[in-house]
Amino acid sequence: MFTKTFGCVRFIYNKMLGDRLDYYKETGKKLKNTPAQYKEEFPWLREVDSLALTNAQMNLNKAYSNFWSNKKHFGKPRFKSKKTGHASYSTNNQHGSVRIEENKVKLPKIGWVKLCLHRPLMENSIIKTVTISKTPSGKYYISILVEYENQILLIIPKKFLGLDFAMHGLYAVSYTHLRAHET
C-alpha cells in the first residue's frame, strides 16, 4: 500500500503540474485545481489517503510560490520521477487517524504498521503530521511531527524578601525596620 500511495502522490503532483503548465500556456492564467477533481477520471486515487494527495497539491503550490518569489534561487517546478528510488508522502492527523500504541503506528487507509520508535514521545504530545519515506535501498522511515507544551517547573522559594523604596532616602526591608539609602 505504501508503494501505491507513493505512486498516486507522484502522479497527482505531475498531473496537476502538467495541467497547470498547459492552462498557463493557453490562457496566461493560473489553474486552480484540486486532487478531488481527478478522482472521477482516475478512480484508483480513491484507494489512497486523500490528505496525502492534498499535501502533494500543497507541495506544488509551495514550489510555485518559491519560484515566483525568487526565480534565480528556486527554479521552475519539475516533474517527479519514479526512477530516483526515493519516495515519500505526508499525511495529517485528523481526529486521531494517526496514533501510536506500543510498537505500532496507525496510518490512514493503511492500518497498523510495526514501528521501531527511536525516542519516546513527550507526555501530552499531539501528533500533527507523519511523513513516510522510502530510501533507494528499500528501507522505510516514518518522521513524526508532534506539538506539545513545555511544562514550566514551579520553583517554590524558601525565603521571601520585600523591599519598599521611598524617595526621601529611606527604604524598608521586610526583615528589619527602616534604613538609610546608601549611594
Regions found by a protein language model. Name each.
Residues 1-179:
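Nucleic-acid substrate recognition interfaces
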